[in-house]
Amino acid sequence: MKNTVCTALMLLMSVCMYAQELYGEYEKKVYVSSQGDSLKYRLLRPEAEKAGKKYPLVLFLHGAGERGDDNQKQLVHGGQMWLNPVNREEYPAFVLAPP
């Protein structure tokens, strides 16, 4: 029983670490208004960002399956699409993902 619990915990920890690596390129940010209200969001910058060049802003609005307030669930399905190296090269953009 003890070995089963240890194995399950190790598996869970490895999955959590993989998720952090997967979305690591998305910067964790927090907007704070002048009234003190805050909004967490994730920002993905263009891979080869050049100073002075303009890039489009993609506002990634997720569905109900990705709702939450942990600032990571919103990336579960569509967030991977923007990390694809081909997409990042072909469509350089800022990707903003609120929770």
What are these regions (language model features)?
Residues M1-L22:
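Bacterial Sec-dependent N-terminal signal peptides
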Residues C6, A48, E66:
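Residue-level marker of positions within ordered structural domains that often coincide
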Residues T7-L9, A51, M81:
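N-terminal hydrophobic alpha-helix used for membrane targeting or insertion
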Residues L57, L61-P99:
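Active-site machinery of serine-nucleophile hydrolases
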